[in-house]
């Protein structure tokens, strides 16, 4: 029923575009024209579809490969070796877009250097009631309170196993896969939820993410406390180390931007003590920066997009310093240009992710970020991404 509704809305869009206009628009869509997506197609879709319906339609189209193939060719300058793998380019899709592992291959086709799916919870759950996603177009931002809606480990495992051999080849070619793990809303043992995720999906992932920073599951962020985090990660690492050596993924922790200085010091201490493989910095923010213009800015949930950019970059800078640059960081939050990506890399990120930018600019934004990043690396005298990692700390 829901899919028929989405098809009807898409048909309405076809009628609006009209015959000759549709033909030209189809050409621009197929070629991935950046201006057409940013100035015409994406605003039109936003006018026709509510945010969650648009999200579901985007996942559906991506899963079917009905998107322009990336035109930008990755150069050697963009290659990064980190977390035990080669990354063809440092721009990945953040968790939250493909929550259930339905569109992995389409996302690689879009030009991402790595894909992260999830968050995946042990048991299926619906998440919070709708509406739960809100656009702030004036701010190039989104507020969401999805609440870990998930198909569950069993369904996602089935999907990933069906393409396991294909993924092994992609990983070898520099296109790794990450899986973001969450806990069920009603769970009384968070550590066991994450451990179960490691057991089931660990053998199918190149890296796992322990997501303790979503603001939309009650009590989740308290797991970032020093004692709670140490207990949780100790169990997760025990489960990971119990997997067959050939299937032992890296383990990363995803943290919030809304942390005190003491919180950050404690997290850095635990991460170094236990030998965690990396950090993802940051999740969405519950803060509302001054100057937000969107009418829905007061909605409850996590804010992502442009208003998060500087806060996440500063958190990257601090975590890089606190870990002496020895713990790889994936930087996420407000990336929509090569400049945004390079700022995070110079602050200490080895890789970056984006998601909200797709909402406003469409698939061509991936190639745009990579093209601009390469140009800036050359302009600033870097031989490649690797040379720029943490550069601001060496000035």
UniProtKB/Swiss-Prot annotation:
It is a single-pass membrane protein. Binds 1 FMN per subunit. The uncleaved transit peptide is required for mitochondrial targeting and proper membrane integration. The gene is DHODH. Monomer. The keyword Oxidoreductase applies. Substrate binds at residues 99, 144-148, 211-216, 283-284. This is Dihydroorotate dehydrogenase (quinone), mitochondrial. Its cofactor is FMN. Gene3D superfamilies: Aldolase class I. The active site is at residue 214. It comes from Homo sapiens (Human). It is linked to Postaxial acrofacial dysostosis: An autosomal recessive syndrome characterized by severe micrognathia, cleft lip and/or palate, hypoplasia or aplasia of the posterior elements of the limbs, coloboma of the eyelids and supernumerary nipples. Its main location: mitochondrion. The keyword Transmembrane applies. The lineage of its organism: Eukaryota, Metazoa, Chordata, Craniata, Vertebrata. Residues 1-10 form a transit peptide. Catalyzes the conversion of dihydroorotate to orotate with quinone as electron acceptor. Required for UMP biosynthesis via de novo pathway.
């Amino acid at each position: 029923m829901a899919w028929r509704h989405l098809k009807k809305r898409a048909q309405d869009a076809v009628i609006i575009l009209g015959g000759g206009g549709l033909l030209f628009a189809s050409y621009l869509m197929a070629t991935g024209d950046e201006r057409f997506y940013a100035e015409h197609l994406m605003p039109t879709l936003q006018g026709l579809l509510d945010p969650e319906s648009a999200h579901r339609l985007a996942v559906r189209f991506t899963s079917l490969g009905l998107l322009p193939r990336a035109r930008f060719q990755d150069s050697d300058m963009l290659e990064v070796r980190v977390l035990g793998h080669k990354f063809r380019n440092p721009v990945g899709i953040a968790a939250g877009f493909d929550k259930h592992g339905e569109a992995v291959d389409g996302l690689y086709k879009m030009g991402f250097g790595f894909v992260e799916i999830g968050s995946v919870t042990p048991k299926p759950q619906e998440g919070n009631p709708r509406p739960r996603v809100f656009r702030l177009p004036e701010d190039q931002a989104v507020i969401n309170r999805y609440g870990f809606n998930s198909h569950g480990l069993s369904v996602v495992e089935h999907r990933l196993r069906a393409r396991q051999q294909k993924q092994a080849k992609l990983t070898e070619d520099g296109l790794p896969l990450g899986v973001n793990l969450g806990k069920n809303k009603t769970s009384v043992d968070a550590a066991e939820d994450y451990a179960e995720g490691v057991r089931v999906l660990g053998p199918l992932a190149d890296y796992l993410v322990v997501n303790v920073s979503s603001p939309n599951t009650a009590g989740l962020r308290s797991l970032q406390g020093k004692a709670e985090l140490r207990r949780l990660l100790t169990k997760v690492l025990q489960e990971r180390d119990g997997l067959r050596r050939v299937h032992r993924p890296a383990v990363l922790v995803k943290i919030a931007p809304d942390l005190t200085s003491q919180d950050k010091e404690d997290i850095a201490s635990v991460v170094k003590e236990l030998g965690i493989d990396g950090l993802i910095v940051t999740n969405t923010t519950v803060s509302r920066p001054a100057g937000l213009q969107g009418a829905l800015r007061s909605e409850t949930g996590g804010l992502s997009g442009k208003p998060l950019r500087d806060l996440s970059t500063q958190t990257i800078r601090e975590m890089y310093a606190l870990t002496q640059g020895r713990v790889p960081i994936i930087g996420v939050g407000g990336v929509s240009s090569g400049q945004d990506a390079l700022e995070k890399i110079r602050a200490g990120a080895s890789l970056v992710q984006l998601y909200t930018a797709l909402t406003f600019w469409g698939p061509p934004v991936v190639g745009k970020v990579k093209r601009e990043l390469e140009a800036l690396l050359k302009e600033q005298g870097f031989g490649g991404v690797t040379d720029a990692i943490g550069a601001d700390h060496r000035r």
